[in-house]
Structures are given as structure tokens and as C-alpha cells.
Amino acid sequence: MVKSLSEFQLRKRPSWSKKWGVLNLSTVPEAARGKSVTLKFSATASNGQTVSYIMGPYSITNMDRKLDLVATDNKACYLSIADMTLYDAAGAATNAAKIDLVYLYRSIAGITFAHALVSPAASVDYLPGITLPSGVNKSTKMSKTWALNDFNLARLQYGIYVDDVDFQAIDFTNAPNFVINLKAQAGSWVETADGKYRAYIYVNSVNNTTSSMTVSIKRYLMK
């Protein structure tokens, strides 16, 4: 995660992480995604003398992001990382091959469960009261975090940026396929069952009354 005053974020302009040498664009053209770029700065003085400075090459980010998805228990609760979309049961049945996680909220006496993201293939102990649509059966690896307030997702005062290299470095060996007791400013690293995507899911807010949770996602294409 980048913590650097040299990093800047400007709306509709690229942000450059000097530490990692990654151009992080708000909107990345598909043709440029994952490639590299060299920057050349030139100036001409009043006497005609010229000077130029070349920087790079820098890698263009291979990430996408989606903000403020509202997951609601037993409604829009089926999350697809490929689509970065939440589906209800009918939508999940139609897109079964894309469903990676189920959101649920449970208040269980003697157990700290609350807001959870659970793989469809997890033990039924972590899916109480859930009847999965036909074909929804993936096992998604997860690693819970706390206070990793990525600026793009949290939009708080913190100068932390989850970048491409962070997704590459995460070790999912022996990772569980569920996370429970999620709270605002918590999050989870995620790897899809086919290994195609990794993602960071940030929890913006939770609401016990409406059994809902608002999340924002950064997704990284691995292969």
C-alpha cells in the first residue's frame, strides 16, 4: 500500500505513485491497461535553448473499481467479482457461473457473526438460512483486513492506496472462504476460484436495522 506525499489524485487525470512507478488512471482505456508508458517533458527558453527530461517507463494499472454497492440480506446479496455487481436470487440463478460471494447478516446469540461475506461452497454453518440458487457453488479465497482505508474506495482523509503490486503480493495459501463480523472500515482481499481476479472489498458502512452493507471494490486482473 502506498503512503506517499508524492502521489496525487486528480479527477480525470492520471495519478502517479513514485514509490511503485505505477500510473493509476481514473478511467483506463482497455488498449492501455497493464502496459507501460514513458513521459517526456520539454521546455524552450526565451533564448531558444531547449531542455527535455524523460521519466519512466511506468506501468499502467491493471485495476478496475466500483464504488458504493449496497448489499442487502436476502435481496441483492450475491456478488460477482467479474461483473462487480450484486444480484438478487433470480439474477444469481441466471449468472450462476459468475457468483463468488454471498452477503448475509445474522444476529446469533453467543456468536459474533453479524455482517458476512461467504463463498457459496463454504460450510453451511456459515450460510444459515440460505438456499443457494442452482449452480451457485464457487469457493472464493478471502483474507480479512482492518483499517486498510484505500483513498479511492473510502474517500476519507487517509493517504493509502491499494495498488497493482499489492494484489500480486497477497498470499492466499490456506486462506478461508468466508469472512464474518465485518464492520465499517474493515475489508477483505479476495481471489476468485479460477484465479482470474483478485479484489479488495472495502466496507464503507453497515446497517444492522436494514441488514445491509455498503462496499466499494478494487479488482485486479491476474490472467
Predicted segments — roles?
Residues 1-223:
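Surface-exposed, beta-sheet-biased, low-hydrophobicity segments with strongly acidic/polar composition
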